[in-house]
Design a protein with these regions (language model features):
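Intrinsically disordered, low-complexity non-transmembrane regions of multi-pass membrane transporters
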Residues: 1-19, 25, 71, 75, ...
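N-terminal alpha-helical transmembrane segments of multi-pass membrane transport
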Residues: 1-74
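Hydrophobic transmembrane alpha-helices of secondary-active transporters
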Residues: 34, 57, 85-109, 243-246, ...
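Interfacial helix-loop-helix linkers and transmembrane-helix boundary segments
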Residues: 39-48, 67, 81-82, 102-117, ...
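Alpha-helical membrane segments and immediately flanking helix-loop junctions
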Residues: 88, 96-102, 117-127, 131, ...
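Entry/N-cap segments of selected transmembrane alpha helices
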Residues: 108-129, 280-307, 358-362
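Membrane-embedded hairpin module used as a gating/binding unit in multi-pass transport
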Residues: 175-251
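Transmembrane helical segments that form the transport core of multi-pass membrane transport proteins
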Residues: 223-307
Length: 383
Protein backbone atom coordinates (compact mmCIF):
# COMPACT_ATOMS: atom_id res chain seq x y z
CA UNK A 1 0.00 0.00 0.00
CA UNK A 2 2.80 2.41 0.93
CA UNK A 3 4.51 1.59 -2.38
CA UNK A 4 1.37 2.57 -4.29
CA UNK A 5 1.03 5.82 -2.32
CA UNK A 6 4.72 6.64 -2.88
CA UNK A 7 4.42 5.91 -6.60
CA UNK A 8 1.31 8.06 -6.94
CA UNK A 9 3.03 10.84 -4.97
CA UNK A 10 6.03 10.70 -7.32
CA UNK A 11 3.75 10.86 -10.36
CA UNK A 12 1.94 13.89 -8.96
CA UNK A 13 5.19 15.70 -8.14
CA UNK A 14 6.61 14.95 -11.59
CA UNK A 15 3.60 16.53 -13.29
CA UNK A 16 4.03 19.94 -14.87
CA UNK A 17 1.91 21.65 -12.21
CA UNK A 18 4.75 21.57 -9.69
CA UNK A 19 7.50 22.78 -12.03
CA UNK A 20 5.91 25.69 -13.86
CA UNK A 21 6.01 29.37 -12.93
CA UNK A 22 3.42 32.12 -13.48
CA UNK A 23 5.48 33.15 -16.50
CA UNK A 24 5.02 29.72 -18.09
CA UNK A 25 1.26 29.92 -17.64
CA UNK A 26 1.22 33.43 -19.14
CA UNK A 27 3.17 32.21 -22.18
CA UNK A 28 0.69 29.32 -22.53
CA UNK A 29 -2.07 31.94 -22.74
CA UNK A 30 -0.06 33.83 -25.39
CA UNK A 31 0.25 30.56 -27.34
CA UNK A 32 -3.53 30.14 -27.14
CA UNK A 33 -4.01 33.68 -28.50
CA UNK A 34 -1.66 32.94 -31.42
CA UNK A 35 -3.50 29.68 -32.14
CA UNK A 36 -6.80 31.57 -32.12
CA UNK A 37 -5.45 34.18 -34.55
CA UNK A 38 -4.12 31.45 -36.84
CA UNK A 39 -7.08 29.05 -36.80
CA UNK A 40 -10.10 31.30 -36.26
CA UNK A 41 -8.91 34.51 -37.93
CA UNK A 42 -6.70 32.89 -40.57
CA UNK A 43 -3.63 35.08 -39.89
CA UNK A 44 -0.83 33.19 -41.67
CA UNK A 45 -1.68 29.78 -40.16
CA UNK A 46 1.29 28.10 -41.88
CA UNK A 47 3.56 30.21 -39.68
CA UNK A 48 1.55 30.82 -36.53
CA UNK A 49 0.29 27.28 -35.89
CA UNK A 50 3.76 25.65 -35.59
CA UNK A 51 5.22 28.70 -33.79
CA UNK A 52 2.42 28.87 -31.23
CA UNK A 53 2.48 25.10 -30.67
CA UNK A 54 6.24 25.21 -30.09
CA UNK A 55 5.58 28.02 -27.60
CA UNK A 56 2.96 25.88 -25.89
CA UNK A 57 5.23 22.82 -25.66
CA UNK A 58 8.27 24.59 -24.22
CA UNK A 59 6.23 26.29 -21.51
CA UNK A 60 4.47 23.08 -20.50
CA UNK A 61 7.64 20.97 -20.69
CA UNK A 62 10.79 23.19 -20.69
CA UNK A 63 13.12 20.17 -21.07
CA UNK A 64 11.94 19.73 -24.67
CA UNK A 65 14.55 22.45 -25.41
CA UNK A 66 17.19 21.04 -23.05
CA UNK A 67 20.70 21.53 -24.45
CA UNK A 68 22.94 18.46 -24.77
CA UNK A 69 25.55 19.89 -22.38
CA UNK A 70 22.87 20.45 -19.72
CA UNK A 71 21.42 16.94 -19.82
CA UNK A 72 22.44 14.19 -17.40
CA UNK A 73 22.55 11.47 -20.07
CA UNK A 74 24.06 13.44 -22.95
CA UNK A 75 20.79 13.58 -24.88
CA UNK A 76 19.11 16.93 -25.52
CA UNK A 77 15.44 17.73 -25.93
CA UNK A 78 13.75 17.07 -29.29
CA UNK A 79 13.25 20.72 -30.22
CA UNK A 80 16.83 21.57 -29.23
CA UNK A 81 18.01 19.54 -32.22
CA UNK A 82 15.53 21.36 -34.45
CA UNK A 83 16.83 24.65 -33.06
CA UNK A 84 20.43 23.77 -33.95
CA UNK A 85 19.38 23.82 -37.61
CA UNK A 86 18.21 27.42 -37.07
CA UNK A 87 21.42 28.32 -35.27
CA UNK A 88 23.53 26.89 -38.09
CA UNK A 89 21.48 28.93 -40.64
CA UNK A 90 20.45 25.77 -42.51
CA UNK A 91 16.67 26.12 -42.25
CA UNK A 92 16.49 29.82 -43.25
CA UNK A 93 18.52 29.05 -46.38
CA UNK A 94 16.22 26.14 -47.27
CA UNK A 95 13.21 28.43 -46.78
CA UNK A 96 14.72 30.78 -49.37
CA UNK A 97 15.13 27.83 -51.75
CA UNK A 98 11.42 27.09 -51.40
CA UNK A 99 10.42 30.75 -51.70
CA UNK A 100 12.46 31.03 -54.91
CA UNK A 101 10.70 27.99 -56.37
CA UNK A 102 7.33 29.59 -55.61
CA UNK A 103 8.11 33.13 -56.77
CA UNK A 104 7.38 34.74 -60.12
CA UNK A 105 9.87 37.56 -60.68
CA UNK A 106 8.02 38.55 -63.86
CA UNK A 107 6.47 41.75 -62.40
CA UNK A 108 9.92 42.88 -61.24
CA UNK A 109 11.52 42.11 -64.61
CA UNK A 110 8.69 43.92 -66.41
CA UNK A 111 9.10 46.99 -64.21
CA UNK A 112 12.72 47.27 -62.97
CA UNK A 113 11.84 50.54 -61.19
CA UNK A 114 10.22 48.28 -58.59
CA UNK A 115 13.74 47.62 -57.31
CA UNK A 116 13.79 51.21 -56.06
CA UNK A 117 10.60 50.70 -54.05
CA UNK A 118 11.99 47.46 -52.61
CA UNK A 119 15.18 49.30 -51.65
CA UNK A 120 13.27 52.23 -50.10
CA UNK A 121 11.37 49.89 -47.80
CA UNK A 122 14.70 48.70 -46.32
CA UNK A 123 15.05 52.13 -44.70
CA UNK A 124 13.20 50.71 -41.70
CA UNK A 125 16.01 48.21 -41.14
CA UNK A 126 18.76 50.81 -40.91
CA UNK A 127 16.58 53.18 -38.87
CA UNK A 128 15.97 50.36 -36.38
CA UNK A 129 19.70 49.59 -36.29
CA UNK A 130 20.49 53.14 -35.17
CA UNK A 131 17.65 53.14 -32.64
CA UNK A 132 18.75 49.79 -31.20
CA UNK A 133 22.25 51.16 -30.64
CA UNK A 134 20.78 54.23 -28.94
CA UNK A 135 18.76 51.90 -26.70
CA UNK A 136 21.95 50.20 -25.52
CA UNK A 137 22.16 47.06 -27.65
CA UNK A 138 25.63 45.98 -28.88
CA UNK A 139 26.34 46.53 -32.60
CA UNK A 140 25.77 42.92 -33.67
CA UNK A 141 22.61 42.55 -31.61
CA UNK A 142 21.29 45.82 -33.06
CA UNK A 143 21.93 44.53 -36.59
CA UNK A 144 20.14 41.24 -35.91
CA UNK A 145 17.16 43.04 -34.35
CA UNK A 146 16.88 45.58 -37.16
CA UNK A 147 16.18 42.94 -39.83
CA UNK A 148 12.72 42.54 -38.27
CA UNK A 149 11.92 45.76 -40.17
CA UNK A 150 12.01 43.80 -43.41
CA UNK A 151 9.20 41.52 -42.13
CA UNK A 152 11.39 38.56 -43.05
CA UNK A 153 11.53 35.80 -40.45
CA UNK A 154 14.07 33.50 -42.16
CA UNK A 155 16.53 36.37 -42.75
CA UNK A 156 16.15 37.51 -39.13
CA UNK A 157 17.02 34.01 -37.90
CA UNK A 158 19.84 33.67 -40.43
CA UNK A 159 21.52 36.93 -39.40
CA UNK A 160 21.07 36.34 -35.67
CA UNK A 161 22.80 32.98 -36.07
CA UNK A 162 25.61 34.33 -38.26
CA UNK A 163 26.33 37.22 -35.87
CA UNK A 164 26.32 34.93 -32.84
CA UNK A 165 23.23 36.55 -31.31
CA UNK A 166 21.46 33.32 -30.38
CA UNK A 167 20.59 34.92 -27.03
CA UNK A 168 18.15 37.17 -28.87
CA UNK A 169 17.11 34.74 -31.61
CA UNK A 170 13.83 33.71 -29.96
CA UNK A 171 12.36 37.20 -29.44
CA UNK A 172 13.70 38.35 -32.84
CA UNK A 173 12.17 35.40 -34.70
CA UNK A 174 8.83 35.58 -32.91
CA UNK A 175 8.61 39.35 -33.48
CA UNK A 176 9.52 38.98 -37.17
CA UNK A 177 7.02 36.19 -37.83
CA UNK A 178 4.33 37.93 -35.78
CA UNK A 179 4.68 41.12 -37.78
CA UNK A 180 4.68 39.11 -41.02
CA UNK A 181 1.36 37.63 -39.93
CA UNK A 182 -0.04 41.00 -38.86
CA UNK A 183 0.82 42.82 -42.11
CA UNK A 184 -2.93 43.20 -42.97
CA UNK A 185 -3.47 44.96 -39.63
CA UNK A 186 -0.32 47.10 -39.34
CA UNK A 187 0.11 48.42 -42.88
CA UNK A 188 -3.30 49.84 -43.97
CA UNK A 189 -3.48 52.68 -41.39
CA UNK A 190 0.03 53.85 -42.37
CA UNK A 191 -0.79 53.62 -46.08
CA UNK A 192 -4.01 55.60 -45.71
CA UNK A 193 -2.37 58.20 -43.48
CA UNK A 194 0.36 58.96 -46.02
CA UNK A 195 -1.74 58.99 -49.20
CA UNK A 196 -4.72 60.91 -50.50
CA UNK A 197 -7.81 59.22 -51.91
CA UNK A 198 -6.84 60.50 -55.35
CA UNK A 199 -3.41 58.84 -55.07
CA UNK A 200 -4.97 55.57 -53.93
CA UNK A 201 -7.24 55.63 -56.99
CA UNK A 202 -4.34 55.86 -59.47
CA UNK A 203 -4.62 53.11 -62.09
CA UNK A 204 -1.40 51.71 -63.50
CA UNK A 205 -0.81 50.48 -67.03
CA UNK A 206 -0.74 46.74 -67.61
CA UNK A 207 2.76 45.26 -67.29
CA UNK A 208 4.49 44.10 -70.46
CA UNK A 209 4.80 40.36 -71.12
CA UNK A 210 8.07 38.83 -69.91
CA UNK A 211 9.78 36.21 -72.09
CA UNK A 212 10.89 32.80 -70.85
CA UNK A 213 14.52 33.69 -71.64
CA UNK A 214 14.33 36.77 -69.40
CA UNK A 215 12.92 34.69 -66.56
CA UNK A 216 15.71 32.10 -66.93
CA UNK A 217 18.48 34.69 -67.13
CA UNK A 218 17.18 36.75 -64.19
CA UNK A 219 18.20 34.38 -61.33
CA UNK A 220 21.58 33.73 -62.94
CA UNK A 221 22.38 37.41 -63.51
CA UNK A 222 21.16 38.46 -60.04
CA UNK A 223 23.26 35.76 -58.38
CA UNK A 224 26.41 36.74 -60.27
CA UNK A 225 26.00 40.49 -59.75
CA UNK A 226 24.88 40.45 -56.11
CA UNK A 227 27.33 37.79 -54.91
CA UNK A 228 30.26 39.43 -56.70
CA UNK A 229 29.45 42.75 -55.02
CA UNK A 230 28.48 41.28 -51.64
CA UNK A 231 29.70 37.66 -51.23
CA UNK A 232 28.09 37.32 -47.79
CA UNK A 233 24.67 37.23 -49.48
CA UNK A 234 25.47 33.95 -51.25
CA UNK A 235 23.60 31.60 -48.86
CA UNK A 236 20.31 33.51 -49.03
CA UNK A 237 20.37 35.07 -52.51
CA UNK A 238 21.98 31.94 -53.96
CA UNK A 239 19.29 29.62 -52.56
CA UNK A 240 16.51 32.04 -53.55
CA UNK A 241 17.74 32.21 -57.12
CA UNK A 242 18.47 28.48 -57.34
CA UNK A 243 14.87 27.74 -56.38
CA UNK A 244 13.66 30.24 -58.97
CA UNK A 245 15.88 28.70 -61.65
CA UNK A 246 14.34 25.30 -60.85
CA UNK A 247 10.93 26.87 -61.51
CA UNK A 248 11.70 28.90 -64.61
CA UNK A 249 14.03 26.51 -66.45
CA UNK A 250 11.20 24.01 -66.93
CA UNK A 251 13.63 21.07 -67.12
CA UNK A 252 13.63 20.08 -63.43
CA UNK A 253 9.93 20.16 -62.57
CA UNK A 254 10.37 17.49 -59.91
CA UNK A 255 12.96 19.61 -58.08
CA UNK A 256 10.80 22.74 -58.38
CA UNK A 257 7.74 20.91 -57.05
CA UNK A 258 9.70 19.32 -54.19
CA UNK A 259 11.35 22.61 -53.18
CA UNK A 260 8.08 24.56 -53.27
CA UNK A 261 5.90 21.91 -51.62
CA UNK A 262 7.21 18.93 -49.65
CA UNK A 263 10.59 20.40 -48.65
CA UNK A 264 9.11 23.83 -47.92
CA UNK A 265 6.42 22.46 -45.63
CA UNK A 266 8.81 20.15 -43.78
CA UNK A 267 11.18 23.06 -43.16
CA UNK A 268 8.31 25.33 -42.04
CA UNK A 269 7.22 22.71 -39.48
CA UNK A 270 10.73 22.31 -38.05
CA UNK A 271 11.54 26.03 -38.20
CA UNK A 272 8.20 27.13 -36.76
CA UNK A 273 8.16 24.75 -33.81
CA UNK A 274 11.81 25.42 -32.94
CA UNK A 275 11.28 29.20 -33.13
CA UNK A 276 8.23 28.91 -30.91
CA UNK A 277 10.21 26.75 -28.49
CA UNK A 278 12.70 29.59 -27.89
CA UNK A 279 9.96 31.54 -26.12
CA UNK A 280 10.23 30.03 -22.68
CA UNK A 281 9.05 32.35 -19.91
CA UNK A 282 12.60 32.61 -18.59
CA UNK A 283 13.97 33.77 -21.94
CA UNK A 284 11.02 35.91 -22.96
CA UNK A 285 10.05 37.92 -19.90
CA UNK A 286 12.78 40.53 -19.67
CA UNK A 287 13.19 44.17 -20.64
CA UNK A 288 15.35 43.37 -23.68
CA UNK A 289 12.50 41.36 -25.20
CA UNK A 290 10.09 44.26 -24.80
CA UNK A 291 12.62 46.56 -26.48
CA UNK A 292 13.08 44.08 -29.36
CA UNK A 293 9.32 43.82 -29.93
CA UNK A 294 8.98 47.62 -29.87
CA UNK A 295 11.96 48.13 -32.19
CA UNK A 296 10.60 45.55 -34.61
CA UNK A 297 7.25 47.32 -34.80
CA UNK A 298 8.93 50.72 -35.29
CA UNK A 299 11.23 49.29 -37.97
CA UNK A 300 8.33 47.67 -39.82
CA UNK A 301 6.28 50.88 -39.66
CA UNK A 302 9.27 52.93 -40.89
CA UNK A 303 9.86 50.51 -43.77
CA UNK A 304 6.21 50.66 -44.82
CA UNK A 305 6.18 54.46 -44.58
CA UNK A 306 9.44 54.81 -46.53
CA UNK A 307 8.09 52.61 -49.32
CA UNK A 308 4.86 54.61 -49.56
CA UNK A 309 6.69 57.96 -49.49
CA UNK A 310 9.06 56.83 -52.24
CA UNK A 311 6.00 55.65 -54.16
CA UNK A 312 4.60 59.17 -53.85
CA UNK A 313 7.84 60.55 -55.29
CA UNK A 314 7.62 58.11 -58.21
CA UNK A 315 3.97 59.09 -58.71
CA UNK A 316 5.03 62.72 -58.94
CA UNK A 317 7.98 62.06 -61.26
CA UNK A 318 5.92 59.88 -63.62
CA UNK A 319 3.02 62.38 -63.63
CA UNK A 320 0.60 60.04 -61.89
CA UNK A 321 1.50 56.72 -63.51
CA UNK A 322 2.57 55.00 -60.26
CA UNK A 323 0.17 54.28 -57.41
CA UNK A 324 2.04 55.04 -54.14
CA UNK A 325 0.31 52.11 -52.43
CA UNK A 326 2.58 49.61 -54.16
CA UNK A 327 5.53 51.11 -52.24
CA UNK A 328 4.34 49.52 -48.99
CA UNK A 329 4.82 46.11 -50.64
CA UNK A 330 8.58 46.70 -50.61
CA UNK A 331 8.84 44.84 -47.31
CA UNK A 332 9.58 41.18 -47.96
CA UNK A 333 6.41 39.63 -46.56
CA UNK A 334 5.48 37.77 -49.76
CA UNK A 335 2.74 37.86 -50.93
CA UNK A 336 0.92 39.35 -47.93
CA UNK A 337 2.20 42.90 -48.44
CA UNK A 338 1.21 42.87 -52.12
CA UNK A 339 -2.27 41.66 -51.20
CA UNK A 340 -2.60 44.53 -48.72
CA UNK A 341 -1.70 47.02 -51.47
CA UNK A 342 -4.40 45.47 -53.65
CA UNK A 343 -6.95 45.55 -50.82
CA UNK A 344 -6.36 49.20 -49.88
CA UNK A 345 -6.37 50.21 -53.55
CA UNK A 346 -9.63 48.38 -54.27
CA UNK A 347 -11.26 50.06 -51.26
CA UNK A 348 -10.60 53.42 -52.95
CA UNK A 349 -11.65 52.13 -56.39
CA UNK A 350 -13.11 48.61 -56.71
CA UNK A 351 -12.05 48.47 -60.38
CA UNK A 352 -8.39 49.09 -59.55
CA UNK A 353 -6.11 46.05 -59.82
CA UNK A 354 -2.71 46.61 -58.20
CA UNK A 355 -1.69 43.09 -57.19
CA UNK A 356 0.74 42.34 -60.02
CA UNK A 357 2.22 45.84 -59.84
CA UNK A 358 2.73 45.40 -56.08
CA UNK A 359 4.39 42.01 -56.56
CA UNK A 360 7.37 43.76 -58.20
CA UNK A 361 8.40 45.73 -55.08
CA UNK A 362 7.38 42.75 -52.93
CA UNK A 363 9.83 40.29 -54.49
CA UNK A 364 12.42 43.08 -54.74
CA UNK A 365 12.04 43.43 -50.97
CA UNK A 366 13.02 39.78 -50.49
CA UNK A 367 16.27 40.43 -52.35
CA UNK A 368 16.70 43.76 -50.55
CA UNK A 369 16.40 42.24 -47.08
CA UNK A 370 18.92 39.52 -47.97
CA UNK A 371 21.29 42.22 -49.24
CA UNK A 372 20.80 44.21 -46.01
CA UNK A 373 21.69 41.09 -44.00
CA UNK A 374 24.76 40.53 -46.17
CA UNK A 375 25.76 44.16 -45.66
CA UNK A 376 25.68 43.76 -41.89
CA UNK A 377 27.71 40.55 -42.14
CA UNK A 378 30.31 42.35 -44.26
CA UNK A 379 30.40 45.25 -41.77
CA UNK A 380 31.26 42.88 -38.93
CA UNK A 381 33.62 40.68 -40.95
CA UNK A 382 31.36 37.62 -40.70
CA UNK A 383 31.32 35.15 -43.60
Amino acid sequence: MSYIITTLGNLVHQSAFFGLTWGNYLMVLVAFVFLYLAIKKGYEPLLLVPISFGMLLVNLYPDIMLAIEDSSNGVGGLLHYFYLLDEWSILPSLIFLGVGAMTDFGPLIANPASFLLGAAAQFGIFAAYLMAILMGFPDKAAAAISIIGGADGPTSIFLAGKLGQTKYMGPIAVAAYSYMSLVPIIQPPIMKLLTTKKEREVKMEQLRPVSKLEKILFPIVVTVVVVLILPTTAPLVGMLMLGNLFKESGVVKQLAETASNALMYIVVIILGTSVGATTSAEAFFNFDTLKIVALGLIAFAFGTAAGVLFGKIMCLVTHGKVNPLIGSAGVSAVPMAARVSQKVGSEADPSNFLLMHAMGPNVAGVIGTAVAAGTFMAMFGVM
